[in-house]
Amino acid sequence: MARTKQTARKSTGGKAPRKQLATKAARKSIPTGMGGMKRPRRYRPGTVALREIRKYQKSTELLIRKLPFQRLVREIAQDYKTDLRFQSHAVLALQEGAEAYLVGIFEDTNLCAIHAKRVTIMPKDIQLARRIRGERA
């Protein structure tokens, strides 16, 4: 079938202009100075992330809550021996070590992602970091 050139036709109606919702109309009509709630500041994507990175790099406090970590330690220890008791300093030492390990693995994971020309870490980056470290064959 041969193609034919289409000519412009006059419109016979079409869609009517949509009415604004009451909330949108009210929001536009009320100036911000007349008692309207001021919206919180919206930062550009990545700004808050960089601020958090700087904040956590400066700090030395533990990032995992103490009680949930303690429950996890007790749950894992119960698989090996029941009725084990832990000194509070022992649980803190375990938590320090666990957090240091996690920070290190995430640093290596980030390097693996950057090497792959990405900024987002993925499970395959963690697997590669562990493989290079010799933790998993």
UniProtKB/Swiss-Prot annotation:
Post-translational modification Phosphothreonine, affected residues: T12
Cited Pfam families: Histone
Signal peptide: none
Positions of post-translational N6-acetyllysine modification: K10, K15, K19, K24
GO molecular-function term, one example from the UniProt record: DNA binding
Function: Variant histone H3 which replaces conventional H3 in a wide range of nucleosomes in active genes. Constitutes the predominant form of histone H3 in non-dividing cells and is incorporated into chromatin independently of DNA synthesis. Deposited at sites of nucleosomal displacement throughout transcribed genes, suggesting that it represents an epigenetic imprint of transcriptionally active chromatin. Nucleosomes wrap and compact DNA into chromatin, limiting DNA accessibility to the cellular machineries which require DNA as a template.
The name this protein goes by in its record: Histone H3.3b
Taxonomic lineage of the native organism: Eukaryota, Viridiplantae, Streptophyta, Embryophyta, Tracheophyta
Gene label: soH3-1
